[in-house]
From Swiss-Prot:
It comes from Paraphysa scrofa (Chilean copper tarantula). This is Kappa-theraphotoxin-Ps1a. Its main location: secreted. Keywords: Amidation, Disulfide bond, Ion channel impairing toxin, Knottin, Neurotoxin, Potassium channel impairing toxin, Secreted, Toxin, Voltage-gated potassium channel impairing toxin. GO terms for molecular function: ion channel inhibitor activity; potassium channel regulator activity; toxin activity. Potent and specific blocker of Kv4.2/KCND2 (IC(50)=5 nM) and Kv4.3/KCND3 (IC(50)=28 nM) potassium channels. Acts by altering the gating properties of these channels. Also shows moderate inhibition on human voltage-gated sodium channel Nav1.7/SCN9A activation (IC(50)=423 nM). The presence of a 'disulfide through disulfide knot' structurally defines this protein as a knottin. Belongs to the neurotoxin 30 (phrixotoxin) family. Disulfide bonds join C2-C16, C9-C21, C15-C25. Coiled coil: none annotated. Expressed by the venom gland.
C-alpha cells in the first residue's frame, strides 16, 4: 500500500512519487 510520504524506490517501501507502486517505479536517485 502506497502512501504519499513513501516517495522512494527502496526495498522496504517499494513506492514511488505520485503514489505509483513498484511496477512503474523508476529509481532516479
Amino acid at each position: 500500500y502506497c502512501q504519499k510520504w513513501m516517495w522512494t524506490c527502496d526495498s522496504a517501501r517499494k513506492c514511488c512519487e505520485g503514489l505509483v507502486c513498484r511496477l512503474w517505479c523508476k529509481k532516479i536517485i
